[in-house]
């Protein structure tokens, strides 16, 4: 989407509608903050969403953060969002592509994506700091419960009752 991507893995990207709404709110706020700082509209990376009980049990063997017993991931109310990696913008900004002939646009898009990924990698701490501020505000508003996971470089995000 405009605000996030789902990193390929063995976790289906299914969530309850309130999580999708929450992701839209967080993505909008994140990109607004980036725009205020003159940065491109980077997107959030979802690393995990819906999990079966079996998948959760397997994960628990290697991940100390994985809940024992029932996990909120089993209900589609939770996603894990990377705080160390951010995806390039969904669209190449107009100022990069305007005036470029149609036959060159695919090449320019590919080069722009590579450049955005390179900048994202170098600026991941700054982007992560901005995103953490957005999450803290969402938690203060009661629309999200956020858990910082050190070993997996993700925020464990559960939709809040206020959503």
Task: Tell where the protein language model's regions lie, with residue ranges.
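Active-site acidic/histidine clusters and adjacent loop/turn architecture
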Residues: 1-40
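Generic detector of short, locally flexible boundary/turn motifs and exposed helical patches
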Residues: 8-14, 43-49, 110-111, 119-125
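N-terminal start-of-chain detector that recognizes signal peptides
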Residues: 15-20, 50-56, 118-119, 126-132
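Charged/polar, solvent-exposed surface patches and flexible loops
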Residues: 28, 57-61, 129, 133-137
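Acidic helix-start/capping segments at beta-turn-to-alpha-helix junctions
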Residues: 39-57
